[in-house]
């Protein structure tokens, strides 16, 4: 964070924004043990999340790494990969500490990576962060890595179960199944997904919502659908009806793909340099004029 701030100063960037992203909430390994000089300092707080076991000189092995923690000699659990393991269920606490530390040391916004889109979970962490940094602002990734349908259906299922509603017609682990699409549970889940951004901003203090990689998925899905139609019963109509016709009627500029690739710009330059002798790509007979 200090390096980024220094770069802003060197480059004369007066309105640069630093977003500090935590490790994923579900991440359970680390490659390092923090330096600590006294009990309770930042390094000591970080090390407190390590999965350790108390040892003595009798059960100490060659090459073991040991630290002093709370007056005891402990051995952090080290995997064959040489990574150290965090204690189970410390993810939220680690993200909270990471976020507070980042904000106190120059970050403008924090970005917490959760393992599911759950407003209550996000709000709980932000409440803890704001106890120390009241004006903390969160960037949240509405990630395609989440199974949004299953997650929200399970959240509705759990809520119905807690309130004593009849859930006998649902199987929690199978809620992604199409057979549930028209059920009240699925409709409630979709309503929650629809209002997720507004609800999360209001209830969990999310300052900015982003979504990573959506066009990767839309490109893959549309290409798959086109291939099925073009090489299936629809033939060329699969492209015309579901792509080109929609481009024209919805005013998508890419329908003139020659223009979007710069053909007009190229022709202008050719004409400027060669005049009437210019060999231009466009002209009255160019297919682009059909659009």
Language-model features, listed with the residues they occupy:
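Alpha/beta enzyme core
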Residues: 1-210, 223, 263-291
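Short acidic/histidine-rich active-site segments
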Residues: 211-215
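TerminUS-proximal long segments
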Residues: 252-264
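HKD (HxKxxxxD) catalytic microenvironment of the phospholipase D
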Residues: 231, 251-252
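A SIS-like phosphosugar-recognition module
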Residues: 149, 217-218
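C-terminal helical cap(s) of enzyme catalytic domains, especially alpha/beta-barrels
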Residues: 220-236
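Long, low-complexity, intrinsically disordered extramembrane tails
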Residues: 239-244
